[in-house]
């Protein structure tokens, strides 16, 4: 379907001056500062030797790339068919599905106690791979949805900029950990406090900028699609890595990397490809998708943290039981003079080789 033959649904129009207001500029600057701080903090948790190991044995990276560019685009395409979405709706979802992994995956991997070295390597490789995979996937899956040429709309400069904003602060963090480790706790604490404060500012500015415009994309089928896509990524990423027998830490990492998409790139493509009168409220679909990414990611973190609190209690019960059994046996052994102070007492009357004292005497 040609873009110029499609009209914006709901007679939608963007807020006046959208994208050029002072609040828009402030939001963009804050998001950049947040990303740099997060990547710097995450770099302080990484080790160069472990990063190099993931390149020498790239099993986890390959699985993640397959999950990212195999599962997510196919899921987006199938969901568009299942929910009978319009051409523009299906295209907006497909662009999100073909985007590389987002930087939020690194932060959520840290919260899920995943492999941070693998996470950063995966994000970097995913972005590099996007330079070729995004135009190819958009060309393949958009056939029958959109008659225009999407492969020329891929924001290559945006992808390269996102790589720079990941690699440079991470490299600084790795340097600090290896050469100035005494600074690392201060960097992590300051980064956490500043990031939390900026998150509040981002929330307030986003509400001011978008207002009630996002309500236009909260239709039942778009809500269902934007909730199922990240969930599918989280679930299938974990299952795929489990099938290849990766350790639990790597499974959680690949799960987060697969489920989180770079919605900023999706917004850029939609903005470049379609004028507002064509894309209409679907301009805000990436924001809706990001909300569900965050909500589902936080839900998985809560479930995982609850699991960690329950699991040690079971282990502690076993330890306490064994300790109690040893304590009950010790007084009796002391009375008989058979306790040596280190090992649990043996059965009375038996020597270590299984013969009683009478048999030994004979």
Curated annotation (Swiss-Prot):
Glycosylation sites per record: 5, 11
Q: How does the entry describe its membrane topology? A: Multi-pass membrane protein
What does the entry report regarding how activity is regulated?
The transport of bile acids is sodium-dependent.
Q: Which UniProt keywords apply?
A: Cell membrane, Glycoprotein, Ion transport, Lipid transport, Membrane, Phosphoprotein, Sodium, Sodium transport, Symport, Transmembrane, Transmembrane helix, Transport
Q: Where in the cell is it found?
A: Cell membrane
Listed Gene3D superfamilies: 1.20.1530.20
Q: Name one GO cellular component term.
A: membrane
Q: Which residues lie on this side of the membrane: Extracellular?
A: 1-22, 84-86, 143-156, 218-219, 274-280
BP GO annotations? cellular response to xenobiotic stimulus; response to estrogen; response to ethanol; response to nutrient levels
- Where do the segments described as Disordered lie? 332-362
Q: Which residues carry this modification: Phosphothreonine?
A: 330
The keyword Transmembrane helix belongs to this UniProt entry's keyword annotation = yes
Write one Gene Ontology MF term. bile acid:sodium symporter activity
Q: Where are the transmembrane segments?
A: 23-44, 48-83, 87-112, 116-142, 157-179, 184-217, 220-243, 248-273, 281-311
Show the ranges annotated as biased composition (Polar residues).
339-362
Which regions of this chain are Cytoplasmic-facing, per the record's topological domains? 45-47, 113-115, 180-183, 244-247, 312-362
Q: Per the record, what are the reactions this protein catalyses?
A: estrone 3-sulfate(out) + 2 Na(+)(out) = estrone 3-sulfate(in) + 2 Na(+)(in); cholate(out) + 2 Na(+)(out) = cholate(in) + 2 Na(+)(in); taurochenodeoxycholate(out) + 2 Na(+)(out) = taurochenodeoxycholate(in) + 2 Na(+)(in); tauroursodeoxycholate(out) + 2 Na(+)(out) = tauroursodeoxycholate(in) + 2 Na(+)(in)
Protein's job? As a major transporter of conjugated bile salts from plasma into the hepatocyte, it plays a key role in the enterohepatic circulation of bile salts necessary for the solubilization and absorption of dietary fat and fat-soluble vitamins. It is strictly dependent on the extracellular presence of sodium. It exhibits broad substrate specificity and transports various bile acids, such as taurocholate, cholate, as well as non-bile acid organic compounds, such as estrone sulfate.
* Family named by the database record: Belongs to the bile acid:sodium symporter (BASS) (TC 2.A.28) family.
- Name by which UniProt lists this protein: Hepatic sodium/bile acid cotransporter
Whose protein is this, by species? Answer: Mus musculus (Mouse)
